[in-house]
């Protein structure tokens, strides 16, 4: 059994913490603040799809892997706030991260919040020591920034970054949080 961490690539698009949608990229490009859940300190591990594929391939045909369970992860982890800061560096523009409690986002009925509620609002850190021991050839080569760059290039080329001006939920929630004091 191989359990990859959050695997991303050009086909999936560039994730964000609070919702399964991509308008946040356009918001950053326009210089508009973006929401994060809480203070953005929840830890997460990301694995670029090409590295994940190599992990699966290197397990094939290995007697010591039969019947085992492996976490297919990078050794490194990152907070969601730093994930978004890395994305901003790749995009070439820095904006304010505005924290909102998960409960406030649920009350506001933020669309596509399920991934945040079930996974991304929480620390998700898994050990890759077992796969490193049994499959030493597996070591992720693509940095988060390089992977993000490849994903953004594909999304731009395919026109998959939506216009953020048509969505109002994020601006409304940011205004509310700024009024009460964001994280």
What are the language-model segments listed below?
Residues 1, 5-43, 87-89:
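NAD(P)-dependent short-chain dehydrogenase/reductase
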Residues 9, 37-42, 70-77, 88-90, ...:
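Glycine-rich Rossmann NAD(P)(H)-binding loop
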Residues 16-24, 37-60, 67-68, 146:
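Substrate-positioning beta->alpha
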Residues 31, 62-63, 134, 154-158:
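Generic structural signal for alpha-helix termini and adjacent loop/cap motifs
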Residues 47, 75-78, 126, 142:
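Residue-level signal for the nucleotide or nucleotide-sugar donor/cofactor binding architecture
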Residues 49, 106-138, 157-161:
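Conserved C-terminal active-site "lid" loop/helix of NAD(P)H-dependent oxidoreductases
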Residues 58-116, 128, 150, 178-181:
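Mid/C-terminal beta-alpha module of Rossmann-like enzyme folds, strongest
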Residues 142-183:
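Amphipathic terminal alpha-helices
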């Amino acid at each position: 059994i191989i359990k990859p961490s959050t695997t991303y690539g050009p086909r999936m698009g560039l994730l964000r913490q609070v919702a399964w949608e991509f308008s946040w990229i356009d918001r950053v490009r326009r210089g508009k603040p973006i929401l994060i859940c809480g203070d953005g300190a929840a830890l997460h591990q990301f694995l670029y799809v090409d590295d994940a594929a190599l992990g699966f391939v290197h397990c094939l045909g290995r007697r010591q892997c039969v019947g085992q369970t492996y976490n297919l992860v990078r050794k490194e982890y990152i907070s969601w706030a730093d994930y978004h800061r890395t994305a901003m560096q790749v995009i070439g523009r820095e904006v304010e991260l505005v924290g909102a409690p998960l409960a406030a986002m649920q009350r506001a009925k933020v669309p596509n919040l399920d991934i945040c509620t079930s996974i991304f609002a929480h620390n998700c850190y898994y050990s890759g020591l077992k796969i490193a021991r049994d499959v030493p050839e597996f070591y992720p080569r693509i940095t988060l920034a390089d992977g993000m760059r490849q994903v953004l290039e594909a999304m731009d080329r395919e026109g998959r970054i939506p216009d953020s001006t048509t969505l109002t939920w994020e601006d409304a929630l940011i205004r509310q949080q700024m009024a009460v004091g964001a994280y």
